Amino acid sequence: MKRMFSVFLLITVWLLVTPFLQAQSHVDKVLKDEITSDLKENILSFWERYSVDSSGGFYGSLGRDGAPIADTPKGGVLNARILWTFSTAYRMYGDTAYRKLADRAQRYFIDHFIDSQYGGVYWLIKADGTPLDTNKQTYGCSYAIYGLSEHFRATGNNESLQRAIELYRIMESKVKDPVNDGYIESFTREWGTPQKLGYDGDGIAAKTMNTHIHVLEAYTALYKVWKDNGLRKRLAKVIDLITTKLYNPQTHHLISYCDSNWNNLDDIDSYGHDIETSWLLTEAAETLGNPEVIGKCRKVALELADASLKEGINPMGAMMYERHKDKIRRDASWWCQAETVVGCINAWQLTGEQSYLESAVRTWNFIKSRMIDKEHGEWFRTVLEDGTPRYKEPKASMWNCPYHNSRMGFEIVARLK
């Protein structure tokens, strides 16, 4: 009798669960298919078609329609992100057109952005490839390591690995704070103290959350291809700094700006950075492979994701930009939306909770309806609170790049197999 009851119970559970799993599988497939189509046919194709500068490298700025904006300086961050994007595209899809663009980006970056005399990375070069702003920003150096590490991973080009290692060693010898640890924000070309902090000269902080999360992703990418014990220790330390010095366990938000002693300098909750960090921390911990660190990072990751989703999502399903003191910046930036989709899928995979998958779909639906430029391709940079895009913003600039939204595509393809 007990056996018959057990069989009956199993059949009942199967009948109840199977439709749910089938529906969930359908949602997964639709999400993956739609995002893959956007990645290959809208984002990557736009950059293939418009970004290549016939005089060398890639244009510094493109208008909404892809037309180059003449004589625009070329940013190190933009070019490192282009390098990362097409290296990843080649690794995932094996398309030789992606390989060609990845190699072009690698060669141009090494030849024009890396300072052969003092080490590190120039912040800006002129349209003709000569140095313009030679200050060293830790943010830019981190992206160089990220892009070069991915190029080696995708192509096996040893020069890329060696350059990434050189930059890592510069970070440890010149940038790391020898007293309080962490990474100082800005330097002169010769690694002296700059007159002004930050990449815009308006910075208030010796150390920032934004730079540290990109040191995290850079060191994670490098450790995937170079299992150096010293790097392993530093990656573990960066994880520790983010989860102890830059994370507020009371608010479940990251601390944006600190002095050299890690004292908080402002009152900001950056929703996009919080949910981006949630999955970057998870990836870093899993790459490190320490079970204790993985457990700690998963806990923090879910707290970051929950807080940003609770406080930062607007009625249209878009992630708003940030809260600064008593004011909320309510516009929706392209990068925040991309990171929200990945962060939600990561949280769903960690917990199995359907609400995270639903949040990912909701934000993707906002991207489809409001953020993708159906006339000229790629995404709008900003959508205002009323749902109107800022039509005149450039598609490429120092900050506009194919990295956040293409990475969303790569992550979804890899995660929803």
Please give the residue ranges for each predicted region.
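Bacterial Sec-dependent N-terminal signal peptides
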Residues: 1-26
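Glycan-recognition and catalytic cores of secretory/periplasmic carbohydrate-active enzymes
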Residues: 24-417
